[in-house]
């Protein structure tokens, strides 16, 4: 890839240096110069619909849209002048022509970009004498409501639904001043209900059925946390409001966009927080008395459990006790649990719900440097191989990153799966192999042509298999992503294949901390760091006597 040279431009008398081809609006943002916009959104196609980003560029006959102009060396730009401010003021006046003045009851009030722009650039009075357009609010789905008069036709929602989510549930009907955002069905959305269209809307045209009329933004405390619904580890921000019963979670969003997920948040991260206050949630420990579980204090519960575990250990031995950990708890909690099991209870009978085989993955990578990739790497990797798993359902952020990479960088994506997964639409090459034959595919990639007999089908001919293998062998900087369908020797074979062509690897866990649970030693035969639970000395020197038999 040819190296991109830096160029220097002048913006409002200030020297700005950025790579050639950078959009002017981004070059300005990088040095703290604000250029307002509604329709522009990083990563989405350029629209130039709102005209709020108009700037004066020397030698240009008229004002230019900063969201579409790429910088060139020596360019001289003015972003603040009487001419520019008047143009922005006129745009605001046009947008407000039919926009209802219902800010006091609009859910976007206090977070509305149009409010902010009007405060900075808008006129105090309108010259329009005609009445505003009034239309009934529409409910497109359980979570998406549309208020047409509030819509400023920035098309962000249409683009993020189509380009970002690859759902294409929204479009534009009619033409010119009659244009209106509309769903892909007559009166309802047929989509994933991810809420990205609501999140990206700069005004209150799209609002959430889960949040409507519950509170005002300034009444909430915004608490950043990590979503626990899958292994992606997305940051989500919970809007928390004080109530008579304590603190209520009223909204989930991605307001600061500084987590690993950037702009993205799926339906689970955005809406699936009601379990926190569910009526069936245990809020106090229970102890069984006379055959019934009754509430008790934490002190009594801990004392009772400790006493019974000690009695069982002393009378029957540590091996009579089994400990089940969780792949949804933190590394610290998992580490302490397995240490408690081994050093206090004297048992290696500790495990968790295992799907992905991270132990085999660790063994296969032993001695290899820089062999693993991250989810963020999938945004820029030139080539990606996906074996098994359905990221759209199981790892939505990973799917979002792959789609973004294909759209912006034209990355090549090779997929082998037993199902017709949604990411197939982004695939350069796709093999639909029989279910449970992922290991045979890896053997074939390693040159075992006889394995092709177990893989061929109407959707994967022998020639297609060979072409798939040859295409992969020719890829540079390949990232191989595989799901829990591969285990043991199959993972070792995949690492052998990938290492031969300089690939990096990502092993996908099915739960929030599947990898951490394995790393921390929630395994019957391995200690933290995948050290054998038998015959080792280092941990015994630190922890004292440890059980030497493998757990169940």
Predicted regions and their residues:
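Catalytic alpha/large subunits of respiratory electron-transfer oxidoreductases
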Residues: 96, 100, 159, 214-552
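Fe-S ferredoxin-like electron-transfer domains
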Residues: 51-228, 232-236, 241
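A basic, amphipathic helix-loop patch mediating RNA/tRNA/ribosome contacts
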Residues: 24-58
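Conserved short loop/turn motifs at secondary-structure junctions
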Residues: 15, 38-43, 147-148, 180-189, ...
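Asp/Glu-centered strand-loop micro-motifs enriched in Gly/Pro and often flanked by an aromatic residue
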Residues: 15-19, 39-40, 138-146, 292-294, ...
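Generic start-of-chain signal for non-secretory N-termini
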Residues: 1-23
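Short, surface-exposed linear segments at secondary-structure transitions and domain or protein termini
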Residues: 26, 30-32, 71-79, 259-262
């Amino acid at each position: 890839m040819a190296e991109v040279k830096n160029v220097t431009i002048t913006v409002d008398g200030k020297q700005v240096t950025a790579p050639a081809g950078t959009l002017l609006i981004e070059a300005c943002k990088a040095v703290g110069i604000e250029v307002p916009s509604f329709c522009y959104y990083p990563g989405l196609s350029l629209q130039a619909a709102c005209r709020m980003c108009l700037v004066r560029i020397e030698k240009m006959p008229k004002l230019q849209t900063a969201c579409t102009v790429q910088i060139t060396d020596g360019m001289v730009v003015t972003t603040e002048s009487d001419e520019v401010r008047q143009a922005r003021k006129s745009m605001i006046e046009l947008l407000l022509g039919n926009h209802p003045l219902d800010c006091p009851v609009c859910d976007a009030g206090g977070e509305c970009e149009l409010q902010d722009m009007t405060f900075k650039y808008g006129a105090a009075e309108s010259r329009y004498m005609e009445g505003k357009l009034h239309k009934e609010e529409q409910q497109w789905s359980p979570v998406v409501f549309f208020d047409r008069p509030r819509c400023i036709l920035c098309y962000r929602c249409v683009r993020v639904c189509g380009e970002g989510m690859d759902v294409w549930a929204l479009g534009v009907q009619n033409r010119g001043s009659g244009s209106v955002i509309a769903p892909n069905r007559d009166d309802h959305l047929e989509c994933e209900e991810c809420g990205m269209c609501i999140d990206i809307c700069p005004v209150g045209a799209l609002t959430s059925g889960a949040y409507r009329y519950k509170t005002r933004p300034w009444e909430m405390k915004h608490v950043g946390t990590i979503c626990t619904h899958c292994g992606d580890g997305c940051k989500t921000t919970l809007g928390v409001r004080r109530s008579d019963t304590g603190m209520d979670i009223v909204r989930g969003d991605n307001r600061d966009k500084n987590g690993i997920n950037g702009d993205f948040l799926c339906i689970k991260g955005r809406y699936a927080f009601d379990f926190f206050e569910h009526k069936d949630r245990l809020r106090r420990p229970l102890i069984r008395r006379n055959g019934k579980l009754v509430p008790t204090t934490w002190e009594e519960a801990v004392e009772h459990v400790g006493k019974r575990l000690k009695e069982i250990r002393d009378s029957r031995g540590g091996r009579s006790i089994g400990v089940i950990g969780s792949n949804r708890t933190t590394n610290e909690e998992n580490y302490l649990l397995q240490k408690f099991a081994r050093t206090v209870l004297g048992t290696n009978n500790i495990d968790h719900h295992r799907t992905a085989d991270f132990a085999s993955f660790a063994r296969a990578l032993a001695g290899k440097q820089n062999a693993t990739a991250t989810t963020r790497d999938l945004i820029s990797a030139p080539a990606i191989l996906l074996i098994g798993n359905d990221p759209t359902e199981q790892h939505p952020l990973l799917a979002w990153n792959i789609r973004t990479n294909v759209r912006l960088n034209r990355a090549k994506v090779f997929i082998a799966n037993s199902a017709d997964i949604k990411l197939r639409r982004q695939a350069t090459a796709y093999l639909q192999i029989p279910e449970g034959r992922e290991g045979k595919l890896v053997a074939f990639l390693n040159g075992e042509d006889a394995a092709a007999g177990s893989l061929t089908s109407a959707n994967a001919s022998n020639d297609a298999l060979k072409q798939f293998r040859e295409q992969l062998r020719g890829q540079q900087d390949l990232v191989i992503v595989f799901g829990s369908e591969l285990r043991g020797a199959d993972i070792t074979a995949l690492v052998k294949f990938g290492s031969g062509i300089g690939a990096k690897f990502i092993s996908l866990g099915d739960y929030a901390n599947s990898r951490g649970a394995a790393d921390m030693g929630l395994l019957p035969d391995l200690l933290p760091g995948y050290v054998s639970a038998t015959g080792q000395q280092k941990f015994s020197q630190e922890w004292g006597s440890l059980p030497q038999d493998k757990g169940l």
